[in-house]
Amino acid sequence: MSDSQQSITVLEELFRKLETATSETREGISSELSSFLNGNIIEHDVPEVFFDEFQKAIQSKQKALNTLGAVAYIANETNLSPSVEPYIVATVPSVCSKAGSKDNDVQLAATKALKAIASAVNPVAVKALLPHLIHSLETSNKWKEKVAVLEVISVLVDAAKEQIALRMPELIPVLSESMWDTKKGVKEAATTTITKATETVDNKDIERFIPKLIECIANPNEVPETVHLLGATTFVAEVTPATLSIMVPLLSRGLAERETSIKRKAAVIIDNMCKLVEDPQVVAPFLGKLLPGLKNNFATIADPEAREVTLKALKTLRRVGNVGEDDVLPEISHAGDVSTTLGVIKELLEPEKVAPRFTIVVEYIAAIAANLIDERIIDQQTWFTHVTPYMTIFLHEKTAKEILDDFRKRAVDNIPVGPNFQDEEDEGEDLCNCEFSLAYGAKILLNKTQLRLKRGRRYGLCGPNGAGKSTLMRSIANGQVDGFPTQDECRTVYVEHDIDNTHSDMSVLDFVYSGNVGTKDVITSKLKEFGFSDEMIEMPIASLSGGWKMKLALARAVLKDADILLLDEPTNHLDTVNVEWLVNYLNTCGITSVIVSHDSGFLDKVCQYIIHYEGLKLRKYKGNLSEFVQKCPTAQSYYELGASDLEFQFPTPGYLEGVKTKQKAIVKVSNMTFQYPGTTKPQVSDVTFQCSLSSRIAVIGPNGAGKSTLINVLTGELLPTSGEVYTHENCRIAYIKQHAFAHIESHLDKTPSEYIQWRFQTGEDRETMDRANRQINENDAEAMNKIFKIEGTPRRVAGIHSRRKFKNTYEYECSFLLGENIGMKSERWVPMMSVDNAWLPRGELIESHSKMVAEIDMKEALASGQFRALTRKEIELHCAMLGLDSELVSHSRIRGLSGGQKVKLVLAACTWQRPHLIVLDEPTNYLDRDSLGALSKALKAFEGGVIIITHSAEFTKNLTDEVWAVKDGKMTPSGHNWVAGQGAGPRIEKKEEEGDKFDAMGNKINSGKKKSKLSSAELRKKKKERMKKKKEMGDEYVSSDEDF
């Protein structure tokens, strides 16, 4: 008897024993059968007949239990034989059907067998196994079968995590449907399985939101909130099929929501995520769900701005998915389809005349190959490792490898290939060759881009304003760029002229020496090389100009033995001579440099390469700036001189009645002293100052000197212990605290637009309503008991209701309480009727009712139409002046804003009411260099007064004229030009507001032109016409305003 015939005989005997086995002998026979099958059976003699009988036994009621136990044993074998694996996977549909059996023992045995198969199968053969499980979920009406299959999928996720990640687009819809099953057990199992499956989503941007995304599948009411949460997310990680499979259900529902804001936010997320898709084939399966929703919204949304955002997302989706304007969806690649690879392998095997009994094995090989194509694994050795063991079942190894290599090449040729930009080859030592992504706040700057720097080369870093050039430089210097060499491997120094103010009193030599860069002799020698004289080396840093500070920073970097210099706008503070010196130095020092500059002439003279921002990538061009512009003409506009990355603008202050010049005091403090209760001495004492629209004041002094206390009294946050504080009735002060975020900390879940609407919804600034100068205290209550003698009766003021002009001041309409039996035990005060209201002059009221008068002044100012409407568009326009775009203002929650964006929001909110004075407490603490430059320019151009508390002389040097030096509670002013009356200078005329005017509630104010007075001749003419009409019409005549 031959070996093969003997094997078949043994199998038949074992199978017969298995059929008749009892519960006591079942395990032993199953184990023996498993060992024999996975042993040394001749590959060409695959026991086809045995497995046919095996399949029938699984379906049999009498034999199922024993056979399922054997399946588990065969699959649990440590080394599952390649000749057995395809056949054992082929039993899965039959085993699945038994997992729903009413017989509990059979159901448990089937579940155990399925889990054993899922654990044992080659991970790359997942495309052979998973379709069976999905088909069972889709077609079965047995809830136990569904629960078992869901548990098996969880096991398969652990066994083949990378492969399941690629199958998520077909897996998630089926699991989602199971989550809506009517059976509670299926729902729970589906939720557990989909949670397990999402472990394959390797995307740091969304991983913390995955529980919410799963919750949205089960509960669609959660969609709006989840879209809001994701809308504040910065997407920087590559978007894969697994990521889209879990995101697209949410986004497609978001596009179909009723609220326009949710539709818009969903479009923003689609736009941001699609930019991170590397391969059009990744997004292709999802185009059918996203494209129609975006098109429909673009056609039906009424809000123009939301339609514009939707159109932007639509364009991005079309570009990434290679969709034409006709919106015909491109064909999805079938390179990784099992049917495609099966066709190729069958064609190659045709000359070998492979027997029909190996069909299951050939189909299994096609499934493995399809998975390798999906994973984009194309190297020969990996294909040999995964596929050869199955090919040698019916071919000799040499023939198998020859056919397999041909199979690999033909299968790989079917993969669609996108454009590939190779870095220009260049000889030299690599200092850096890394791939990374970069974001700032909620904005993606770079996505999976390469940066390669060679020793001794000079690179110009170029891109449009806001592309993130300085952010990239700072990120490299701070070690935040993935893959960039550490300081131990490659010393990188960020050269900036803004030397920290804490070192301003140190000498130049001591400052460089404090950086541990060498001995003082070495440092002195190097500084002299850079042009420093002996006298300058001993000078304090504060006395150096910006240009010399730049040279000092460069000398310190060179002494640190830098391999790479990062230069951010190095020519900003240099004169022509020093620019030429810097050009010569960089060209001859041999140090690699990366330069950001708007000086095109400087870049032309220095750079050997231009690194340019293109579509979230860095692309390198050989040559200087002129050569680069020839290759990329559209880049010319980026590098015009004077280009500014950031600009702020403050609104023009409202008109102040009685203030004819900018020199007239609008805030005046005389002999003011303030002492906190319980302290032994005043915090500030005997302080006198005044502020006008032309004030540019720097408040300086050591910590604890009383600067902030002084400002708090000025702004009304605190009331003085003694002294006088006068503020113009309609003067508005914007105060940005040292801890700027204090203004918005309790509103993080609002959008910036909603925050501003909340803050000013009554017309008043709700942030200032708790200021001490607006709260009625005990002294105020006592003063308000003052008795006025009016029309012979004693009265107390009950309320103040309106204001009108009276000579050079104002008078106020007051309601009263009438006094009866004053001074007696039966004394009482009775409210009087409104007909008894009377007008009292301001000077008389202010002594006892100053805070009530201030409230009326505020309300009158609000009614004057000097405030804009609290509409979304108006708020967006205002915030745009402070560098916040409409996307952030109306559609992003404050919680998701970066630190710099939050500060801009605080600036925007504080200046909403067009303040006359802007007070900033330590702005350099919370604004970066770019924003400080923009703020400095805006404050210079501001038409109101500016008061700044700061330690930074650099910031205030060219901005302020007046200095208040605070020390030990005393304030010494200098540079001031205080005047008693209106003062000199050009007169301020009240300007007529252009365009429509609104009150604080958004109601349009119709301000008609004032009628001119008629002359006596015109009046006589009007009278004659009136008499003529009366005579002609008789009793029918009715006069009108036009007749007079």
UniProtKB/Swiss-Prot annotation:
The keyword Aminoacyl-tRNA synthetase appears for this protein: no
Positions where Phosphothreonine occurs in the chain: T972
GO aspect biological process, one term: cytoplasmic translational elongation
Modified residues (N-acetylserine): S2
Record field: catalytic activity: ATP + H2O = ADP + phosphate + H(+)
Residue numbers bearing the N6,N6,N6-trimethyllysine modification: K187, K196, K789
Bias type Basic residues, positions: 1020-1031
Residues annotated with Phosphoserine modification: S974, S1039, S1040
CDD domains: ABCF_EF-3, CD_eEF3
GO MF: ATP binding; ATP hydrolysis activity; RNA binding; translation elongation factor activity
Subcellular locations according to the entry: Cytoplasm
Highest taxon, organism lineage: Eukaryota
Free-text disruption phenotype from the record: Decreases translation of proteins required for detoxification of reactive oxygen species. Sensitive to hydrogen peroxide. Increases GRX1 mRNA level during vegetative growth. Normal vegetative cell population growth on glucose, galactose, and glycerol carbon sources, at high temperature, and at standard temperature. Normal mating and sporulation.
Residue ranges of HEAT repeats: 5-42, 86-123, 124-162, 166-203, 205-241, 242-279, 285-323
Disordered: region residues: 975-1044
Misc note: Present with 125 molecules/cell in log phase SD medium.
Annotated function: Ribosome-dependent ATPase that promotes the translation of proteins required for detoxification of reactive oxygen species. Required for the ATP-dependent release of deacylated tRNA from the ribosomal E-site during protein biosynthesis. Stimulates the eEF1A-dependent binding of aminoacyl-tRNA to the ribosomal A-site, which has reduced affinity for tRNA as long as the E-site is occupied. Assists translation termination by stimulating the release of nascent protein from the ribosome by release factors.
Protein name: Elongation factor 3B
Encoding gene per record: HEF3
